[in-house]
């Protein structure tokens, strides 16, 4: 039996899963780490935390599984996208990584549009300048920390920093590189034109691979730390959403998935390049060679529920600890006791600004309609419904582009909740299913690793062999019109408060 490793480098922690060649999860391990917010709207993490988490989880799964290291033929890494890792000439980290949800770079986005032109930028990178993307973060460092920028010799994404530490190779791949906003997305290579216009040295950037291509193998030092063999191959891997697409089998036209992780995503595969001229959704290279994907992103999906849990659900956390249960299960039970519409309470999930469809770094979250009658269960349901409505916003933009999914899969932590899946089915008005294996991104990069090692001839072939789908939850007919009424009001909240968000940001 051959085995493949999938490493999922997330915002809250890194999870490593060992799979056999048929897609069965043998063993997994998780290590969490903090997120730092030194100022309002800022978000940073320490790259060293990611690396140590990867080493610890790899060693843990190999030890617990008892699998011979020589049978682990390959591995792939999935990573939170857009984070900026800057290394000096010796490969040392120069500063904490500015990660995907950081919102400090509005001025740099304006600078990019002024120099390049918004339309030309979209034609090259398939996206407008956004605060979440790597390019604006790089310019922020150049503008505000010139001494750090002057020492920089390598720019990497989060997962690619871990790859470098495990292999010694400076490499990236097309799906994650698409989110740096320096890639020519239609042609799947770095844009020399864009880099020249912005005076960025191309030598700072790593070599670009396709996601299932082999980029190197485990170094001797990393083999000693992790317990892996030096013969273990490492493939390109993928950005977290592209990895989730592979891990849920969304690798052909007509297929889509919704992720409720820290962020929320509605993601659809397309064999033909499709770009939204308004820049409301993101078009990136897909982990399937020669294909692309279109995705709408909401900044604070699972993050909204985690924020509520950490600040208002201490009793549930304590009870769950005593019962040996996940506190989210107790929170779901409470939310289910509140009716659709949460007793006329709405929640806008703009805790970290918003991407799709508003592209507004200044908007902020709110409860609308709060009264003395409301209970914690109403607030919990409002949070879950508000996130669902924000995902509906994403789906609507895809529909405008002519991308109409026929099947929808749910993944991420929120996708494990039957209540949340039913909300998605009722609001999206389509069946929502899950895969038997819920390790979406980790399975996705493990599949890519299997293709890279020659266990399978192509990504679609590997998906057909390794992925199985559970029965879907269908829309409940009587629920649909109730959600439609609430959603209609939800869509007015942003426009009604857009000006106030700007005023708030100036305080």
Model region roles, listed by residue range:
Residues 5-6, 21, 106, 113-130, ...:
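Active-site core segments that coordinate phosphate-bearing ligands/cofactors
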Residues 63-100, 128-134, 163-184, 207-210, ...:
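Short beta-strand-loop/turn "lid" adjacent to the catalytic site in phosphate-handling enzymes
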Residues 1-95, 123, 151, 220-224, ...:
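N-terminal glycine/serine-rich phosphate-binding loop of ATP-dependent small-molecule kinases
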Residues 46, 102, 240:
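Short, conserved phosphate/pyrophosphate- and ester-handling motifs at nucleotide-, phospho-/glycolipid
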Residues 43-51, 98, 321-324, 384:
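Flexible, glycine- and charge-enriched loops at secondary-structure boundaries
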Residues 27-31, 206, 471:
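Structural signal for short hydrophobic segments within the conserved structured cores
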